[in-house]
Every structure is written in C-alpha cells, then in structure tokens.
Amino acid sequence: EFLFHHGLPSEESQYRSYRKLLEWAGAKPVTIRTLDAGGDKPLPGLEQPAESNPFLGLRGLRLSLRQPEVFRTQLRALCRAAVHGNLKVMVPMVTVPDELHSTRELLEDVCAELTAEDIEFHKPVLGMMVEVPAAALAPELFTDAAFFSIGSNDLVQYLTASSRDLHHVADLADPGHPAVLRVIRELVEHCDCSGQELSLCGDMGSDPNFIAQ
C-alpha cells in the first residue's frame, strides 16, 4: 500500500485497501504489518534522515513512532477496516518493550478518538515482528505481544553482521548458520511455554528444508 504510492496514502485510501483484503479473506485471519519504511525501503513523501547505515537506523516502528500523525492515520484505517474481517496487526523492527507499549497507547488513543467521532471500528490484535537480536534473545520481555512473527531476512542479517544488500558479503548471511537456527529454536520453545503464536516470514519461510531443523 505505502510502497506503491508516489506519496503517503490517505486514511480513506488505506481503509479501502484493507477492507477489500479482509472481505476477500472472509473469516480467515489476515495479518497486516504496519509501515516498514527505512533501510532498503525508502518512502516518497516521508521525511527520513540521511544515515550512513540505514539498516541500523530509523526504520520500521522506530520511524513510525517518530512520525505519530502518519502512524495514527494508518492505525485509524486499520481499526475501521477490522470491522470487516479477522484482522491482526504486527509492528516491525521492535527492540525494546517500551516501543510496543507506545504503540498500544497510540492504538488506545485512536480507538477513543473513533468512539468520540461515532465511527464504527474494532480494535485488532497486536503482535510484533522478531528480527532484532535484542528481541529475539529476550522474548520473555514482550509479554503483551499477542503473537510473534520472525522476520528471517533481517534476523539473519543482524545475527551474521552481513548487510543483505551487499553482494560481497552475501555468502555470510546464511540462514542455515547454527546461531540463526538456535535463536529460532529457542523462540519456538519460548512460545510453546508462553502460549504466544509464532510464525515465520522472509526467505526461510519459503524453504521447506528448514522445517525439520
């Protein structure tokens, strides 16, 4: 939705897109990731600082929390669209629990705002992506995340300290590295105990060879 616009999409534009997707899915759950700009995903119309290493800078949820009006607009559209299906919302690039708490507070504000405006809405379930090692190694800190989704591309990049946009170190960004597999295995074990849902996205999610590992 964001990446295919020449500028920032309006609340109505986002609402229509989300609603169309949810109505198509019917009763099936639909997970929508909030704005994940920055790094390898620059976004026209959004002010982003020049950074020497954007993969470690202001991207994902970090950027959304610095642009609260943009984030609020998306959350309003998501809450309105949630009336039309089974919506889950996940936030990317989470490092510390305070970021998730701030998101939840903003979501509550948006719900209160929509109530005051007498606009129909439903508060979606809120989860997070696990791609930053600090979050991957300490999932017990995120007790209020309804679910986790492992962002394997970034997790591999950060665990191997190998930028995935540089071909001369691409061979080091190995998803089969024992450290990567260990972190994912420990996340699975944590979620088995905590009851939190866990899914896998990114390139590893399309490779059946990793299922047995």
Q: For each of these PLM feature ranges, what is it?
A:
Residues 1-213:
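Conserved alpha/beta-domain cores
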